[in-house]
Amino acid sequence: LFLQSIYYGLKLDSVCRKIKSRHKFEYDLNAILSDLIYTRVLEPSSKSSSFRAAKQFLEPPTYELHDVYRALSVLASEMDFIQSEVYKNSFFLGDRMDRILYYDCTNYYFEIEQEDGDKKYGKSKEHRPNPIIQMGLFTDGDGIPLAFSLFPGNQNEQKSLKPLETKILQQFGCDKFIYCSDAGLASEDNRVLNYMGQRAFIVTQSIKKLPAEDRAWALKKTGFKRLSDDKPVDLTKLTDDDKNQLYYKDEPLTTKKLDQKLIITYSPKYAAYQKAIRAEQISRAEKMVANGSLKKQRKNPNDPARFVNKVAVTNEGEKAKIHYYLDTDKIAEEEMYDGLYAVCTDLLDDDVADILKVSEGRWQIEDCFRTMKTDFEARPVYLNREDRIKAHFLTCFLALLHFRLLNRSLKGTYTTEQLLHTLKDIKFTDIEEQGFMPVYER
């Protein structure tokens, strides 16, 4: 019922009528789409299982399962239209913070063993060997979904931004915003794209990938100020009271195409956290050295094996013996970056605290992906046809939009888990001659 109020608030029934006027079909697209969205939130499963689950709703389906699969093809063909319409209609439910747009990418795996269409072998976020498809997602400043796109699993995700952003500019009427992303989607081309018109950018920056001169400046513990009052500080003389503060310094970072500001922040609390994590990893690396064993494959950059090196020692005429040792140079190099974080922006005159606050909001889009993958079970994907796969992700996107808008209407007082649990507990029973009666606690 609560999801239904969001559905009709977004005027998706009207959107379905507009779509019907362009296609020849007899089934009730509005009923199918709404049921797909509700079941994705309440009982995420396959399309056939969702159809069975929908039969338990107050208004059970009057359509058949084969109608659902036919509707998926229609929904896929209208994917861009539906996204732009729900964005415009979402203003009927409240203002959108569309002056800040967060962008990120993730991928979803398929239960197949061969590449097919856009389902390509690529770098899976979950380290799975299956073919994947990638998704680019924009959210507004409140973490409410705005638009998404799909692209092949083997494509560089940096190139996914321009087509989707162009769609937003042309179809959504949204052309004045600050683009915000992590360093992985902050190539110079993507920054230049948001250096034009009424757009700007705030992106994280890898300190290790800075030009040598700028990297050396960033690593120096001099020139920092306390963020709260701009008071200059000596990072080597911080007291215990100072360790909960955040410190920063900034400088121009100019390229042939861009005038930017580079902001370096230092957090003593984050530095202590990184040091503690690394101490555990060093302990595990020391055990590897003692045991004389080292994994050949390193799956991630935080693997303790990165601190283990090897050298071959030979005696004349004898086969080389491999000796493992702890790489103290590698450890010392990593320690230099403890507590440091970098952000780049073309908002040269804006307050540093405001810029950092926008950048910190990126957690919301990461939470969107977690909700889609874990709570809405958007993966693995079992569909084969490209159009039906598009429709699957469209319904996942719309389900996420409904869920976020509902949570906002509740002033964000519930966690994802709490709100889902509450929605799933809302049940009714059909009492003879009395109609439906609620059987849940408010």
Please state what every model-predicted region is.
Residues L1, L10-R442:
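Anion-binding and metal-coordination hotspots
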